[in-house]
Structures are given as C-alpha cells and as structure tokens.
C-alpha cells in the first residue's frame, strides 16, 4: 500500500486547547469532563514523483527524544529527508507541530528539502497572533528556512495533485486530491476528519462555519463514493484510510475489503 497513516495516539482536549495523551485502556474519560477525545495521524503517500506528507501532527517526541513524526516515517520505510512535498490543510497546532525540529539547541524545518504548500490566507492568519490555535514561532522558522509555496483559491500543484479552498473548519482551510498509480487519494483535513462524520450529520461548534463543513462532508462523500476515492481521515479513531460507498446512506470500509 502506498499510503501510510502515521499515528501519534489518542488525546483529550479541553477549553485550553492543550492536547493531553489519553489511553482508552487505562484512563477514565470522566476524569476529563468537558474534553473532546481525538486521535491524530498525519499521512505519508508515495507517488511516482514524490514522497508526500499530509499535515504534520503535534510535534511530540518519543522516549528517545526523536520527533515522533520522523520516527513514524522511518517505520514506514522512508527517511524524513526523502519527503519532497508537505501539503497543509490548515495551520492549527495539532496539524503543524511536526513541521519543525530542535537539534543542538536550534530549531529548524523538520523537512528542509520539501516544498510546503499552504493557503496564503491561512499563513497570514497564523501571523496575526489573535488565536491560540496557531503557534507563530513555527511559521517564523518556516519563513526563514523552509521552501514555502503560498497558494490562493483552488488549483493544481503539479500533475495529478490538486488543492481546493473549502473554508468550513477555518476560513482558509483546503483539501487535496492526488492521483497516483490508477488511484485517487483524498485528504479532507478537518472538514472530513473522521469516517463517522459522513454517517452522522451535524454542524460542529468548533468549526468556523459548521453548516458549511456539514455540507462539504456530504458533497465530498458523494464524490468519494462515485469516483472510488481512497480517503485519509486525520482524526479517525479506528479506520484512518477508507473507501466510501453510498446506498441509503454512507458507509466506509478498509480499501482491502
């Protein structure tokens, strides 16, 4: 399989927006009242031309002091230096922590040779300093030392890779579609973060425009079913990569089933 879910674990998030590790087998949700419980997994996709990272996780380190994202990329059979393209759905903290890494007391890009594709409006929003959802110091490092491509609206990155400005979760959220080896991969970021959100219709209060996100999920779900997309779910609890079918409603199954 060319797509790899780089799981970073399960977390609880309260009103402080701090991500605290949560072990469903040992921790009691009642001890964390008022919290959301989510999983985090960036994705790595090998195409004919690129090694693509889709969003970058929390930036946590493992027990050896290594960036967890780097460790997970190696476990998938690649080296972090091989990543050529970093596609960012948006720039909230839980999607950007792994974009930078500290070595010998200095912080630099975690993927110095990769092109980072970011919506210009989202980039500018991150520098405003008006929301705790963004960590400005990360973007200062990227601005100084990384290859950043700022895009606007919707378009083509290169052959087979497209981006679409959606809004919904935040004003400048974008999604990506990648055609490779006869398959189409769809990364919906936080507009379509879990397969369950296709099955259960709701407008989330944590979205910038919850109703629009709900409508987008319906739209993308229908396209995914009609065109046999392989969907990547960044906050999925169980099924991180799935294909969508639609009869009376949506269902999602593993690509191999």
Can you describe what each PLM-predicted range is?
Residues 1-49, 245-246, 254-257:
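Zn-dependent metallo-beta-lactamase
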Residues 51, 58-144:
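Active-site HxH/HxHxD metal-binding segment of metal-dependent hydrolases
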